[in-house]
Amino acid sequence: DTDGDGYVLIESYSNDGTKTDNEYMESLNAKKIQGYVKKSILFQVTPSSKYALLVDKLRQKMYIFEAGAIIGELDVSTGLNNAKQPYNESPAGEYITVSKVGDFDAGGRTIGRFAIRINGGTLLHEVLHDKAADGTRIYTQYEAQLGMKASHGCIRIQRRANAQGQNMQWLWNNLENKTKVFIWDDQGRQMYEPELPDSSLQLYRNPNGGSNYHVDENCSG
């Protein structure tokens, strides 16, 4: 929206690590800032083309893309809302990463690591852990929640490396600023089992070469 003097109403989120009097809430939700700026000083941001992330709230998975192809997937926990705290839902949409926040205190002795802020204010971070008196990180409670909604709105991401060596620390080390992040909603969607062919289906291969199976014995590929 613009007013009559060529100004545009914008909104942003604090990302400088400054804490409010409510440290716990500030660590989870960046402080929202609104104001008018001159339209002439605005410019379009070009997202990084190296990687992209897709968070599927239905499957509670994060998919890592490179050059348009999926190169890995990670278990996540997105926001769990309820009647009293509907704002805990992780908002679906299209975002970019805007800053690396690092480790943060999520209340008491609970810590989140490698936090990256997206422009919607949400944090992507390693699954939480409780810090024992001797400094040991205890992930048991929060790792058990991966694959289901559990957070206050942030995206918790697995710490154990997948087969490709990817985890939250890998994202921290490899993602450039302004990486595209897509969050798919789960409302109105259903998860289906993969469609498997009937056991009686006859499959053929081309005897002259080719690696694909076909249902037609006169296949050509």
What are these regions (language model features)?
Residues 1-37:
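SH3/SH3-like beta-barrel superfamily modules
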Residues 12-14, 66, 185:
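Residue-level signal for short segments within beta-strands and strand-turn junctions
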Residues 30-137:
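Gly/Pro-biased beta-strand-loop elements
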Residues 38-39, 157-159, 214:
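Zinc-coordinating Cys/His ligand positions in small cysteine/histidine-rich zinc-finger domains
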Residues 48, 88-92, 104-208:
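Exported/periplasmic cell-wall-interacting domains
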Residues 59-65, 195-218:
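Extracytoplasmic/periplasm-facing segments of secreted or lipoprotein envelope proteins
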Residues 3, 15-16, 69, 102, ...:
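Acidic glycine-/aspartate-rich tracts in secreted/extracellular proteins
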